[in-house]
Amino acid sequence: VRGDDGSTEYRFAARRLSLDHWHIDPESITRHASAPHGEDTGASDGDGDGDGSDAELPLDALDLVIELRTALGLSEQVLPVYLEEISSTLSGTAFKLAAPPVDAAELARSGFQAVETGMTEGHPCFVANNGRLGFDIAEYHAYAPEAATPVRLIWLAADRAHATFTASAGLDHDTLLRAELDPATLDRFADRMTELGLDLADFHLMPVHPWQWWNKLSVTFAAEVAQRRLVCLGYGDDEHLAQQSIRTFFNTSEPSRNYVKTALSVLNMGFVRGLSAEYMKATPAINDWLHGLVARDEVLRATGLAVLRERAAVGYHPAAYEAASAKGSPYRKMLAALWRESPVPLLEPGERLATMASLLHVDRDGGSFAAALIRESGLDPAEWLRRYLDTYLTPLLHCFYAYELVFMPHGENVILVLDEHGAPRRAVFKDIAEEIAVMSPDTPLPPEAERIRAEVPEDMKVLSLFTDVFDCFFRFLSGILTTDGVLDEDTFWAAVADCVTGYQKSAPHLADRFERYDLFTDRFALSCLNRLQLRDNQQMVDLQDPAGGLQLVGTLENPIARFR
């Protein structure tokens, strides 16, 4: 690979796998001085004789990006921010490598949160996948998932006249808070309000990320605090751990209590990670609809699929910032939170949990988490893979073909329920309201959930499966299992094809849809996710029209086409 001006050249050894996946030997990567385009060095064999043009240069990731800025399409506005994201990602990688080593086999036997904080990759599709711009080094150690530092959330009281609380049917604000906070904590909060001459009954309680309070709200919302529309009540008592998605917390003091997802105004992987107060209004209704659909559908019940409902949400509406900013602006996403069900109460005796992203974890010695699970299970690798596909892929196929319902089913949004030996039993989907879409005008939705209906061109609908499942997850998992010698590529993709075929045979009434949205087509469009971030790392896609902003470049050979 030559730099834009031809003055540098990168060389490496790679094994090319399905879906144009390059498994690169990191030890083989070298950087060399090279004659600029159009200059004749007099060296015809590339050995650099006579001009020193083949001299080896030190490797530097920032230099690589700068030398390829034109080829990568990086604008003057995006480039420095992208360099900062790369630097932060490398810093995080260095932190992980400096930690005491835990091999993949040991991690595969560990508990849910040890796996969550011990894995190395959440989104390998993106190069700059751990930007977290806004954290200083102390905040990184306090709040990064891999730091595994216990966090106590800050609680605010928000004047009900300026805040919106919504909840699932049968759940109200007071019932939720009595379940989420100990009586002593609630009493302390109420006493603080009384000291200020205020009545807690006139306010909604809101959990806040500590970073958001100290770096954003305490200054940006100073007027709201001065007017006592917002009252800081201090830290809660429960300890939490940040999850791979960075702004969501798992309660380690009481694991059966809800996850808490908070607004966090840091730039991370293409977005400022706030939460929209406006979006929060419909969140419980969307989750109730999906939960009801899964409960009623025989196929989904048979797969064991569960969804973690976002049972309640609260958002604060700062009048000045809402008047001054457009819909979708980070200024409208500074103060909101939601409560999502914990997966712990779903477990049966002997079962354990692992975020699906962990299947892509490889330890510093090259050991694979997925391979370790397979060995631990005692199953033939092909049988382990079949069980995994039954729990993960089959529900996605059915939701797409029966309802034109799609998820964002990347590794951080799926939790696997494993048996005591590490074999997959069922899948749990999460991050519902912000990530799902219904592409059919005919699938009935309650009025309050209509925002998830999306207009998508017919020829792009099935791309959600090809891109999000095949290219963004199976490509990496297949590559890991293949290079680890666990399964060859043909066996992996044949198993995927068998899962698709098995589902299609079980649903002959959907035959016309299988033909219209053909998963066995010879090729499919390549949706380049990194190009989204390279084009605009502040707002990677328009959430109102996600399909309209895709970067489609060429096609990929479908790895299951030959198994039709």
What residue ranges belong to the model's regions?
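Catalytic-loop of the protein kinase fold
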Residues: 406-408
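Canonical protein kinase catalytic loop motif
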Residues: 410-412
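Nucleotide/phosphate-binding site architecture used for ATP/NTP-dependent chemistry
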Residues: 1-45, 50-390, 419-564
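Conserved kinase catalytic-core helix
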Residues: 384-403
